[in-house]
Amino acid sequence: MSGKRVVVGLSGGVDSSVTAWLLKQQGYEVIGLFMKNWEDDDDSEYCSTRQDWLDVASVADVIGVDVEAVNFAAEYKDRVFADFLREYSAGRTPNPDVLCNAEIKFKAFLDHAMSLGANTIATGHYARVRQAANGKFELLKAFDHTKDQSYFLHRLNQAQLSRTLFPLGEIPKTRVREIAAEIGLPNAKKKDSTGICFIGERPFRDFLNRYLPTQPGPMKTPEGKVVGEHIGLAFYTLGQRKGIGLGGSRDGSGDAWYVARKDMASNTLYVVQGHDHPWLLTSELNAADLSWVAGEPPAAGATMAAKTRYRQSDAPCRVVAAEGDALKLSFAEPQWAVTPGQSAVLYDGDVCLGGGIIQ
């Protein structure tokens, strides 16, 4: 029976719950695993761990599966959160969900699942895995492109993908909700989580301020005119419009203000007016810390598509260079607010090839 034993990551949400139910219907021996990956005061206004665990227990009872809780808080702190703080301190805007998937959900969690005698794991991610004719495992977009999460999974390798199931990859999100209601899941109408991976719905600036000091400095236009003061470069990201503190018209223009650049050396935040200001547009990018799903980079000169942020439409591009740990892309059309620290992820149609961290 162990050949059909699968450990499902249960978060308390509807996606992972339906994932467990679908696999049980397919004849798998399903074990549920609830991960606690953040240590905080359970009485915190924003801490949902206790309620999530109660939801998991209720779902497991309805589906008829065993469930256990495991604490990966130490691993998360060392492998994900430390990098998160380093990146923000350096003025970049990291995407912790990408690293969390590679290091926690598909490494620490996978290792624990194997210790339980399982051959595979499953999560409620919207993505697909298939084995190509050459034997390599491919990561593909979900059929429901509006919910596709392959962007967050692009750092998964062959060993991880070969032991992973994504049952929701071929199901529209609307149908997932319908299934949850039809089988009587208590969390069928629970809203989707939108906070940082495992940190929840806390106000982000308040959360970051607990770990990084504020270092106020000048806010300038490209011409060097001081138009305000920022609270610290770590608290802003390229393309940001809200929370800058520059409302109304300036210099006769009614256009909104956007964060355009950060100068760490002078602790200066540069802002511009207008969504399509030249400082917000770029036709090339460089990326490092590369990871390729098949273990090999794309060939220089290859044409494909890239995403530089989640939910962005695929942008046609050309691989200028991909050697060692350096990737350079050239886009057919200028890209808006390409942000250092975020991931540039390459696609060949629906196939996610991998990517790296924008420099």
Curated annotation (Swiss-Prot):
Domain of life, per lineage: Bacteria
Primary location class: cytoplasm
Matches recorded under InterPro entries: MnmA-like, MnmA-like_C, MnmA-like_central, MnmA-like_central_sf, Rossmann-like_a/b/a_fold
Region (Interaction with tRNA): 147-149, 309-310
Coiled-coil region(s): none
Location within or outside the cell: Cytoplasm
Keywords, comma-separated and alphabetical: ATP-binding, Cytoplasm, Disulfide bond, Nucleotide-binding, RNA-binding, Transferase, tRNA processing, tRNA-binding
GO-annotated molecular function: ATP binding; tRNA binding; tRNA-uridine 2-sulfurtransferase activity
GO cellular component: cytoplasm
Disulfide bonds: 100-197
Site for Interaction with tRNA, residues: 125, 342
Binding site for ATP: 9-16, 35, 124
Function: Catalyzes the 2-thiolation of uridine at the wobble position (U34) of tRNA, leading to the formation of s(2)U34.
Catalysed transformations (reactions): S-sulfanyl-L-cysteinyl-[protein] + uridine(34) in tRNA + AH2 + ATP = 2-thiouridine(34) in tRNA + L-cysteinyl-[protein] + A + AMP + diphosphate + H(+)
EC nos: 2.8.1.13
Source organism (scientific name): Cupriavidus metallidurans (strain ATCC 43123 / DSM 2839 / NBRC 102507 / CH34) (Ralstonia metallidurans)
GO BP annotations, alphabetical order: tRNA wobble position uridine thiolation
Protein family per UniProt: Belongs to the MnmA/TRMU family.
Descriptive protein name: tRNA-specific 2-thiouridylase MnmA
